[in-house]
A protein has these predicted regions:
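RecA-like P-loop NTPase motor core of helicase/translocase proteins
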Residues: 1-508
Length: 508
């Protein structure tokens, strides 16, 4: 807007041309970098959604009120999420949280609750009228008639015509996959092909074309590290999410502005000592997790260094016979006991401050088949059915829509209820799980991916003790942990990660 940048290379040429010597110039000539494109690197829990709000309001009010059309602003906005939880979180932000009656209450939306922060008095009616008329859920894109702009929220699967629940199954495992690809479907309720279903399938492609035909648009990609390239043999390939964005951008040039948000905007190649991190070239700001911890914007992370963990092998996978799971490994049992022990200490300690604050433990398994074994073990340790919540997902960490509705119901106001105490998941809760009371994380996995580790920690970073009367206590906690290297007097807004000591290097 100020520098009149037209593409990613312009950022370097305008601010620091010398940096181009360190960049892959051929890569920067790709179409996905040929328009205004920016990446905001922010630690989880530090307000990425709020930055989106501010950018949207600034853009919309300028586009609506500028005397001479400059082409620098837009009234069309597309928010793209990597999955159902982040998608629901974005809907919460703009049209309010789902209440126990199943309806959304706009009074609980971010913009309504914090209107004093985001919107000057003279413009409030303008902004709220725009949101009410322009908002489109993923099912409404291209169907709903909006006012003078668009505020569309979707997951990337819709843009590429995929169901989010499709497993990665080969045609050899299920021949009907090949049949569906080769033969057209016909209406018939017995096969599940009602006219409504066929209509929805038809509109999947239409929604992408509708967005492509807009004269201008601003796209906000949440958890945008999923946009990174992937390597197959000696080929570097674009992911489907990026291909869909390129289709929308194709004829817009600099009338297409892309803003990516992620705590981990990079690709990883290699493994072990050969692991390399390749940061996205369009990162323009970096707010690190360690800075957020120092400022008290998120919980302080503490690694549980237990001698019994250090003595165990590093591989924390379940014990198997072929492909069949035999049992949890000794290391996994030790970690679960350590996590449960820590949670009980927190429950007792928190009673001294507020009996209505209930700490939770998040267990992340290597795959969904391990979840029942974790549940069985925790029951043997004394937990009841009500104290445990399982979230099952497919091979890609995704949940079927009908199951997601039940999960969403149980997740509603999870912070306010004593039970469940333990949430067991695979990848589903990796992103967008905005629960404040996760105080213990037990990662039962062998992967040491930097991206995965930071995303897992992110599930427990959101502050639980936000009230002003606890500020001084939390300041003392951070000083003892971070500076004096001492045990704190209490565990207010401290996230305990039960981890093998050899993984600590990644957290450092």
């Amino acid at each position: 807007e100020v520098l009149k940048l037209k593409n990613v290379q312009d950022i370097y040429m305008t601010i620091n041309p010398e940096l181009l010597a360190e960049m892959d110039l051929l890569d920067m000539q790709k179409g996905k970098y040929s328009h205004p494109k920016y990446c905001i690197k922010m630690a989880t829990g530090t307000g990425k959604t709020w930055v989106m709000h501010a950018l949207l309001i600034w853009q919309y009010l300028n586009a609506k009120n500028e005397e001479t059309i400059s082409g620098d602003y837009s009234k069309n906005f597309l928010f793209v999420a990597p999955g159902l939880i982040v998608y629901e979180r974005l809907l919460d932000a703009y049209i309010g949280k789902v209440q126990e009656n199943g309806q959304r209450d706009v009074e609980t939306s971010d913009l309504k609750m914090f209107e004093d922060i985001f919107i000057p008095d003279p413009y409030r009616d303008e902004i709220f009228n725009f949101i009410q008329s322009a908002i489109c859920t993923k099912e409404e894109i291209g169907r709903k008639t909006t006012g003078t702009g668009l505020l569309a929220i979707t997951n990337w699967h819709l843009l590429v015509g995929e169901q989010e629940t499709e497993d990665e199954i080969s045609p050899l495992e299920d021949p009907t996959i090949a049949v569906k690809k080769e033969f057209p479907i016909r209406p018939g309720t017995s096969a599940g092909h009602t006219l409504n279903v066929l209509d929805n399938q038809y509109f999947k492609g239409k929604q992408l074309d509708f967005l492509a035909n807009l004269k201008d648009i601003i796209v906000f990609n949440d958890e945008a590290h999923h946009l990174g390239e992937w390597q197959k043999a000696d080929q570097i390939l674009e992911k489907k999410w990026q291909k869909a964005l390129s289709h929308i951008q194709k004829d817009k040039k600099n009338k297409f502005i892309q803003v990516d948000f992620s705590a981990t905007p990079y690709n990883e190649t290699g493994s072990g000592l050969k692991r390399q991190i390749h940061y996205f070239p369009h990162i323009i700001t970096n707010f690190e997790l360690k800075e957020a911890i120092k400022l008290g914007l998120v919980k302080t992370v503490a690694i549980d260094k237990r001698k019994e963990l250090a003595a165990l092998p590093l591989d924390f996978k379940v014990e198997r016979e072929g492909n069949d799971i035999k049992s949890l490994s000794d290391g996994q049992r030790v970690m679960l006991r350590a996590g449960w022990s820590k949670l009980k200490i927190l429950e007792e300690g928190f009673l001294n401050f507020d009996k209505n604050k209930h700490p939770k433990m998040l267990v992340v398994c290597e795959d969904t088949n391990v979840v029942p074994y974790v549940t069985q073990f925790l029951k043997q340790e004394g937990l009841s059915d009500d104290e445990i919540m399982e979230i099952h997902s497919n091979k890609k960490g995704e949940v079927k829509p009908d199951e997601w509705n039940e999960i969403k119901r149980r997740l509603f106001n999870l912070d306010k209820h004593k039970n469940p105490k333990v949430i067991i998941s695979v990848l589903m809760l990796k992103e967008g799980f905005d629960v404040n009371n996760i105080c213990v994380v037990v990662p039962l996995r062998a992967s040491s991916s930097s991206t995965l580790l930071e995303q897992l920690i992110g599930r427990g970073l959101r502050l639980m003790w936000r009230e002003p009367e606890f500020t001084e206590i939390k300041d003392e906690n951070r000083e003892k942990l971070l500076i004096k290297k001492e045990e704190p007097d209490n565990y207010l807004d401290i996230l305990s990660v039960v981890e093998h000591p050899r993984f600590i290097e990644f957290y450092d």
